[in-house]
Curated annotation (Swiss-Prot):
Binding residues annotated for Zn(2+), in chain numbering: 12, 14, 197, 278
Keywords: Hydrolase, Metal-binding, Nucleotide metabolism, Zinc
Organism of this sequence: Escherichia coli O81 (strain ED1a)
Domain of life: Bacteria
Family: Belongs to the metallo-dependent hydrolases superfamily. Adenosine and AMP deaminases family. Adenosine deaminase subfamily.
Name recorded for this polypeptide: Adenosine deaminase
EC id: 3.5.4.4
Cofactor binding mode and count: Binds 1 zinc ion per subunit.
């Protein structure tokens, strides 16, 4: 189901949601952190989704053990490097790694700006080693409040040339996008792109708000757009992309099952939607699974899957020249 003549992308992939269980075990031992289990087999139920979670917040708790072992900036650098290695193993040509440095820093009071620098270093080294192209998207974790988001923003701005876009994720119900208008104004002033998690836990109004108030060029998840025909029309007309994450939306109980997922409808409506993983380490999936298992189960035809793959590159925060070069590189292989 993957067209090998086209670039394979994953543009909604959380770096801090893709920490290998084996790495969690090793870092736990290295830093004498008490884990809920002492073997890989018994640890996995604590760090991966085994059965669908009742809601998004419950799903997010599965990420916590991964960041609890980030006891140093070297640990942050390691997981960033391993994210690129994992992308290469999956056959990805281009990834956009979203990460929340405040969340990664929290357990051991690491300097937030230092985490950003460590992630940049690890990703850069990974790209050099494995030949994958990657860009970094800074996440403000609204779950932790406006002040914490401000701290994350300042850390990103200190490395503005290595950050491609700003994202907003976390508890959308408790912390609506309206609290973060000034943050996104500064992001635009820095020349960054804007993508926002919306229409996942909250309804279609959260997507409208992300577009109108925060200036979103893309929407993360966006499943609730299906409830608003005018919104779907607007997304199609304005070519505002939806970063679809099929398995994730089932595991968070945002959508009942893959057959009910709106991605097929979005594509039929002319919306620029792509296939992505979200938190592959926590979900126990990879991009190959999303294309070959999840997408057909969601009712997508072979041609629709190919269109979603094309959309992934079209939506990517790359220049026209970078996209052309990537297409030519893949076609030449």
């Amino acid at each position: 189901m993957i067209d090998t003549t086209l670039p394979l992308t994953d543009i909604h992939r959380h770096l801090d949601g893709n920490i290998r269980p084996q790495t969690i075990l090793e870092l736990g031992r290295q830093y004498n952190i008490l884990l809920p289990a002492q073997s890989l087999e018994t640890l996995i139920p604590h760090v991966q989704v085994i059965a669908n979670e009742p809601d998004l917040v419950s799903f997010l708790t599965k990420l916590d053990w991964g960041v609890k072992v980030l006891a140093s900036l070297d640990a942050c650098r390691r997981v960033a490097f391993e994210n690129i290695e994992d992308a290469a193993r999956n056959g990805l040509h281009y990834v956009e790694l979203h990460f929340s440095p405040g969340y990664m820093a929290m357990a051991h009071q690491l300097p937030v700006a230092g985490v950003v620098e460590a992630v940049i270093d690890g990703v850069r080294e990974g790209c050099r080693t494995f030949g994958v192209q990657a860009k970094l998207i800074g996440i403000m974790s609204r779950t932790f409040g406006e002040a914490a988001c401000q701290q994350e923003l300042e850390a990103f701005l200190a490395h503005r040339d290595q950050i491609t876009a700003l994202d907003l994720a976390g508890d959308k119900l408790g912390f609506p996008g309206s609290l973060f208008l000034s943050h996104f104004n500064r992001a635009r002033d820095a020349g960054w792109h804007i993508t926002v998690h919306a229409g996942e836990a909250a309804g279609p109004e959260s997507i409208w708000q992300a577009i109108r108030e925060l200036g979103a060029e893309r929407i993360g998840h966006g499943v609730k757009a299906i409830e608003d025909r005018a919104l779907m029309d607007f997304l199609a007309e304005q070519q505002i992309g939806i970063e679809s994450c099929l398995t994730s939306n089932i595991q968070t109980s945002t959508v009942a099952d893959l057959a009910a997922h709106p991605l097929k409808t979005f594509l039929e409506h002319g919306i620029r939607a792509s296939i992505n993983t979200d938190d592959p380490g926590v979900q126990g999936v990879d991009i190959i699974h999303e294309y070959t298992v999840a997408a057909p189960a969601a009712g997508l035809s072979r041609e629709q899957i190919r269109q979603a793959q094309i959309n992934g590159l079209e939506m990517a925060f790359l220049s026209a020249e970078e996209k052309r070069a990537l297409r030519e590189k893949v076609a030449a292989k």
